[in-house]
């Protein structure tokens, strides 16, 4: 594959303005005059180089060399029209930026059209940028399990097939029908290990923003193997189920016996409320037991603004989630803790103790994420595990869905609650969902 050099439009303009000779040695006329006849194309170069090229990336600036180029009225790359600027057209040179939109039909040709509707074709390939590998349908998929990788600029050609490399394993040949511009379907190859997935196209190779089978930042795995396993560290005892990932335990928020209103105006405690409040009813509080620690002692939240909260979720088709949002709330021990109010901890903090007022107290206006998956088209997962991700920078809503006025700090990540309530208008519909959750973790966004 040829070596490419990307330049910005502004740089290209600067090249023309300073009269660099790599594209044209003739001064630009004071005024553009269109000509009759048809153009002739001899070759194409980069605007700042004498290197001849037969292909370029989207949004790159190229210089067409030929004759009678003032006759060009329109220029198309495949089926995408480029923008012409007559200030950068002479009889022998035409400077143009390759369109940034993927073609619907790829012909690998440039079409130069005149005002008399005559068209001249020239063979030239437009390449998308290197692929962007943003997320995967299920980060903990087992070998042989089918997953979907999402991103952009996925494509393959007969002479340059798309390749997917899992850590320690190659996914092999990918069928054309399993590839779209923004997704690719693939089976996890045998022997795949934890790490970043790489995807290669004719445009280059990129590593995933996520880590496959990520073992970093684990807060709760609900079986105590690598993370906390409790489902009861507050006032309410959510259930644990044996149907977790890999046959382990997972959290079960069981609304099958409830009737959730669409807007969440009636909150649901008991089996539909997960609380983890740090502390062990000690005085002073030491957070000394495995399941009493502050979450920010387990994971470093110093750079929380560039982190994401992730977990796997499974929603049965016969108990869909069609309304009533979930509040995802981190909090400091000075707002709520597992113990008595007024007790100090070994760090000098005065603890708030157990309470159910901090999360809807307007004077605190604690930021949180309000999750409405049905609004994005997900009311169930067909009983399969999928990975969901919430940028902590998006934790910005108050209890009722309005913008929160409070601020999060690294100390705000001691506790976690998942709570079906409020935060919505009348969108959605009443429901009795069952929501399984596993592997709650906080990791860098990239």
Where are these regions (language model features)?
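Extracellular carbohydrate-recognition regions
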Residues: 208-255
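Extra-cytoplasmic beta-strand recognition segments
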Residues: 222-224, 295-326, 390, 440
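Extracellular beta-strand ligand-recognition surfaces/modules
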Residues: 311, 325-327, 331, 385-434
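Secreted extracellular polysaccharide-interacting domains
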Residues: 257-306, 335, 348-376
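Beta-strand acidic-aromatic groove motif in beta-rich domains, primarily in extracellular
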Residues: 318-344
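C-terminal motif of bacterial Sec signal peptides marking the signal peptidase cleavage site
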Residues: 18-22
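Beta-strand/beta-sandwich contexts
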Residues: 24-70, 117-159, 194, 203-221
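Extracellular carbohydrate recognition and processing domains
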Residues: 344-406
């Amino acid at each position: 594959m040829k070596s490419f050099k990307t330049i910005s439009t502004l740089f290209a303009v600067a090249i023309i303005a300073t009269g660099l000779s790599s594209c044209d040695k003739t001064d630009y006329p004071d005024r553009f005059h269109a000509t009759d006849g048809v153009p002739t194309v001899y070759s194409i170069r980069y605007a700042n180089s004498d290197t001849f090229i037969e292909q370029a990336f989207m949004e790159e600036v190229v210089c067409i060399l030929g004759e009678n180029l003032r006759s060009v009225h329109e220029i198309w790359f495949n089926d995408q029209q480029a923008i012409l600027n007559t200030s950068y057209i002479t009889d022998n040179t035409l400077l143009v930026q390759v369109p940034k939109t993927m073609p619907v039909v790829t012909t690998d040709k440039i079409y130069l059209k005149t005002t008399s509707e005559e068209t001249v074709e020239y063979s030239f390939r437009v390449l998308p940028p290197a692929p962007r590998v943003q997320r995967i349908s299920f980060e903990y998929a087992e070998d042989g399990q089918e997953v979907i990788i999402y991103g952009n600029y996925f494509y393959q050609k007969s002479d340059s097939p798309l390749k997917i490399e899992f850590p320690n394993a190659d996914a092999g040949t990918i069928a054309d029908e399993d590839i779209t511009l923004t997704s690719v379907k693939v089976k996890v190859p045998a022997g795949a290990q934890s790490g970043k997935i790489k995807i290669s196209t004719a445009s280059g190779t990129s590593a995933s923003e996520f880590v496959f089978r990520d073992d970093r930042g684990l807060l709760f795995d609900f079986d105590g193997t690598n993370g906390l396993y409790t489902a009861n560290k507050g006032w309410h005892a959510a259930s644990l189920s044996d149907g977790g990932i890999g046959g382990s335990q997972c959290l079960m928020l069981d609304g099958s016996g409830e009737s959730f209103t669409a807007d969440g105006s009636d909150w649901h405690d008991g089996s539909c409320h997960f609380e983890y409040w740090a502390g062990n009813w000690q005085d002073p509080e030491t957070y000394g037991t495995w399941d009493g620690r502050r979450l920010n002692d387990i994971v470093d939240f110093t750079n929380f603004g560039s982190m994401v909260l992730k977990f796997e979720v499974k929603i049965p088709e016969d108990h869909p989630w069609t309304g009533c949002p979930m509040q995802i709330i981190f909090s400091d021990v000075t707002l709520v803790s597992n113990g008595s109010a007024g007790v100090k901890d070994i760090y000098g903090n005065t603890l708030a103790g157990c309470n159910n007022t901090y999360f809807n107290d307007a004077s605190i206006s604690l930021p949180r994420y309000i999750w409405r998956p049905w609004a994005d088209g997900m009311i169930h997962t067909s009983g399969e595990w999928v990975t969901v991700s919430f940028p902590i920078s998006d934790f910005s809503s108050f209890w009722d869905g309005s913008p929160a006025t409070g601020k999060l700090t690294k100390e705000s990540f001691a506790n976690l609650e998942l709570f079906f309530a409020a935060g919505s208008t009348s969108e959605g519909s009443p429901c009795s969902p069952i929501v399984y959750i596993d592997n709650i973790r906080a990791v860098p966004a990239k």
